[in-house]
Regions:
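A conserved ligand/cofactor-binding region detector
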Residues: 2-824
């Protein structure tokens, strides 16, 4: 008799069923009892109980996709900053309140158990968090999708602060197992590296290339189910772990080489050991290229396996069934890898293979910074991926001859600029150029960014392919970034606009009509106050610093980079401190400046800025002369779970990058959605946030993109601003003293040098005066509680555009051409 298909209704648990399931897993899965179980055991038992729901729905999703032979998007990203999944999965399965009650009857707090979960920190910042939001939205909107990345053993480092300095520690996020992932040994892939290429006669008489690998690595897949909101679709994030093909040499071991016998195992496992190994050395560069190829090759093989399971070796439908999105340049090598598989392994002719590959790939550009558009030396490519270099040469030759020469005949300068190969003392492979040439669509991630991609970064490519370039403004999932992280505000919105807003964020716009309503303002600001009070306790526990929820909470949380200009925030705080020292009665509302940031291990100036922030904090926070009007807090080990505590409590959102440098930003969206007011430049998504909320509800300052170009074009001299502004000069000169580093003068001088002798490449000094005035405006607004509440409410209510569901729908309509697949 056929098994009856389970519906969503059949799968839904009540409180007693969930409680019984948790206790059962505590005993049978974890082998412990209620009396002696640790909080971690209770958390894992809860996850196991929830996984019964997750895997049932995952199986149903996969069976439906297979049966309907759906077109799917395969999202390749070196980063997936997933954070914690317990709360997220419970919300998406509509089980959060049920679980809270079930655990309450067992004498447990769900929020306490959620704290047992380590962050899945497989990313560095916005790039990885965007990928996580996108796969959430794909599942929520019922689109068939697979995320592909690397199963890093350590992910991003755990940041400790010692004497003000950043110290990197390994982040062993799965040291004791992760209940949300499952290993799939049946889908292991074998990946070749090194070796040489031989030209031989094929079976049909033509010439054929054979790559004889010098070494092979195994890619072991770990699947993390991605539960869409409502629990209908459960897609997967597949992460690849590297292992040796032959990880133990018995002969060497028996001959006494106990350590050498495991050398291959150690070398292979290094590939998926850490996110972004330091590439200052040749060995580091080689490891990073291998890391990128490893996950791309595993993913392409897996995509081929899935396709062949239905279509065999008939590739006529490949481009109609498969879409691959390259999230930045890290997965670029997937393009020559697919060509290698189609031409060398499947015997397809070049033109047919290129036609398929070109249709399949799309590329998202995330940066206008030249150093972030990766380049690899030709010699390194030749050593590690000899066949891929040949394929890149062929792609390049055909592109230059067939497209560039007819368009710009005899123009060698244009050819040199557009070529995938950069000529010079050290010849290099330009991965950004390869992405554009090998993809059918290229998108930027905010309107201003996409305009600059077309006009400044890739103008000739845009001229060749005007239809190729498009925009998809980034977004964030409101399920995590409002429903889960700010439950009080979520409940208020449920009462006012109904419970559909997590799927239709535009519904919040109807709240604007309450922006002047005194009763609603009181409710809204009471919730903000509660969130600030919670953060006060977190700050005390994490840093030992006492702050008051009465103060303005001014928050800058993002990775540390000069273009993001934490140094501008720093020197403004120093200026405020000088004003207070000069006049203890200086009229300002008490302010707490909160930073959360990690610097790349090899980025010395970024680490110096962290050190300066902490040294400033030590001095300011303990100076009784300023009567507690100014506090500085650096929250160590910034991560998704910490962001979920900081964002609901933020009054002011610092989005102060140099105009033209921040592609989009998503922290700006999250904080505005939670009722923070943006102080920012006209850069990235700030422009669109100001359009949605109204420029009068944001504190916009500084040079715009055109003014930045104009100033740089005229010849920017930071000394002009240094000598013209006595306050700015005094602040910068402070860095040379030992005021913040007693007995060690000049320890902070590198920051001043970067802003003066270093040419201040990100125009920090040029924007200082305008930034200072914008902060005075913030201060004035905050002193008028009704005005501030109105602006905060409008900011929150008008962020509907920045739902990642809208972003995904734009990708579907403009690039991927997917159809939703209803499950059940």
């Amino acid at each position: 008799m056929a098994t009856k298909k389970k519906t969503d209704q059949d799968l839904q648990l009540d409180k007693d069923q969930l409680k019984a399931s948790i206790v059962r897993h505590l005993r049978s899965t974890l082998g412990t009892s209620e009396q002696k179980a640790s909080p971690e055991a209770w958390w894992k038992a809860t996850a196991a109980a929830v996984n019964e729901q997750v895997y049932e729905r995952l199986t149903r999703t996969q069976q439906t996709h297979f049966k309907k032979d759906t077109r799917a998007i395969h999202y390749l990203s070196a980063e997936f900053l997933m954070g914690r999944l317990t709360s997220n999965n419970l919300h998406n399965l509509s089980l959060y309140k049920i679980c809270e009650e079930a655990l309450g009857e067992l004498g447990l707090e769900l929020t306490d158990l959620c704290e047992q979960e380590p962050d899945m920190a497989l990313g560095n910042g916005g790039l990885g968090r965007l990928a996580a939001c996108f796969i959430d939205s794909l599942a929520t909107l019922n689109y068939p999708a697979v995320g592909y990345g690397i199963h890093y053993e350590h992910g991003l480092f755990r940041q400790e602060i010692q004497d003000g300095r950043q110290i990197e520690r390994p982040d062993s996020w799965r040291e004791y197992g992760n209940p949300w992932e499952i290993c799939r040994p049946e889908s292991v892939q074998e990946i070749p590296l090194y070796g040489y290429v031989e030209t031989v006669f094929g079976d049909k008489g033509g010439l054929k290339k054979v790559w004889h690998a010098g070494r092979k690595i195994k890619g072991v897949p770990w699947d993390i189910p991605v539960v869409g909101f409502g629990g209908h679709t459960v897609n997967i994030l597949r992460l690849w772990e590297s292992r040796a093909s032959e990880f133990f040499d018995w002969d060497v071991f028996n001959a006494g080489g106990y350590i050498d016998s495991q050398a291959e195992k150690a070398q292979a496992e290094t590939i998926s050991k850490v996110l972004y190994p330091n590439d200052d050395t040749d060995a580091g560069k080689e490891l990073r290229l291998i890391q990128q190829y490893f996950f791309c090759a595993c993913s392409i093989k897996d995509i081929m396996r899935r396709y062949k399971r239905v279509h065999g070796s008939d590739f006529g439908n490949f481009a109609t069934q498969i879409a691959i999105q390259l999230n930045d340049t890290h997965p670029t090598v997937a393009i020559p890898e697919l060509m290698r598989v189609l031409v060398d392994e499947e015997g397809m002719d070049w033109n047919a293979a290129w036609d398929i590959s070109y249709q399949v790939f799309s590329y998202t550009n995330h940066t206008l910074l030249p150093e972030a558009l990766e380049k690899w030396s030709v010699s390194l490519f030749e050593k590690v991926l000899p066949r891929h270099l040949e394929i890149i040469y062929e792609i390049n030759a055909r592109f230059l001859n067939d497209l560039v020469e007819p368009k710009w005949p005899g123009n060698d300068a244009i050819k040199a600029k557009l070529s995938i190969i950069e000529e010079g003392t050290v010849r290099k492979v330009r991965m950004g150029n390869l992405c554009v040439i090998g993809s059918s669509k290229v998108n930027g991630v905010a309107e201003i960014h996409s305009k600059l991609v077309k006009e400044d970064l890739f103008p000739e490519y845009a001229e060749l392919w005007p239809e190729k370039m498009c925009n998809v403004t980034n977004g964030v999932t409101p399920r995590r970034w409002l429903l889960a992280c700010n439950p009080e505000l979520a409940e208020l919105y449920n009462e006012v606009v109904g419970k559909e807003w997590p799927l239709q964020l535009d519904k919040l716009r109807s709240v604007v009509k309450f922006a002047d309503d005194k009763a609603f303002q009181k409710q809204f600001m009471t919730i903000k106050r509660h969130n600030k009070e919670k953060l006060v306790k977190v700050i005390k526990a994490e840093t030992g610093i006492d702050v008051s929820a009465e103060a303005i909470f001014d928050v800058q949380i993002k990775r540390l980079h000069e273009y993001k200009r934490q140094q501008l925030n720093l020197i403004h705080i120093m200026a405020l401190y000088r004003r207070l020292l000069a006049n203890p009665d200086y009229d300002m509302h008490p302010r707490v400046f909160i930073f959360g940031s990690k610097a790349a291990p090899g980025y010395k100036l970024a680490k110096d800025i962290i050190y300066a922030i902490n040294k400033l904090a030590e001095r300011v926070n303990n100076d009784v002369r300023i009567q507690g009007k100014l506090k500085v807090v650096f929250m160590p080990n910034y991560r998704v779970s910490l962001a979920e505590k900081l964002i609901p409590a933020a009054d002011v959102s610092e989005q102060i990058s140099t105009a033209g440098y921040e592609a989009s930003g998503t922290g700006n969206m999250k904080m505005a959605l939670n009722g923070a007011i943006t102080i920012g430049t006209l850069d990235g998504a700030n422009i669109e946030i100001a359009e949605e909320a109204g420029a009068e509800n944001c504190a916009i300052f500084g040079l715009n993109v055109d003014e930045v170009k104009s100033l740089k074009g005229r010849g920017y001299n930071p000394y002009d601003f240094y000598y013209a502004n006595s306050e700015l000069k005094a602040v910068l000169d402070w860095f040379d003293t030992d005021y913040f580093t007693p007995g060690r003068p000049g320890e902070l001088s590198s920051i001043k040098r970067s802003l003066l002798e270093g040419g201040d490449p990100y125009l920090t000094l040029a924007d200082f005066a305008s930034y200072s005035e914008a902060h005075k405006l913030i201060d004035t607004w905050y002193r008028d509680p009704a005005l501030w509440a109105k602006k905060a409410i409008i900011n929150s209510a008008t962020m509907g555009k920045f739902n990642s569901d809208r972003s995904i729908q734009d990708y579907v309509d403009r690039i991927w051409n997917l159809k939703p697949c209803s499950i059940g």
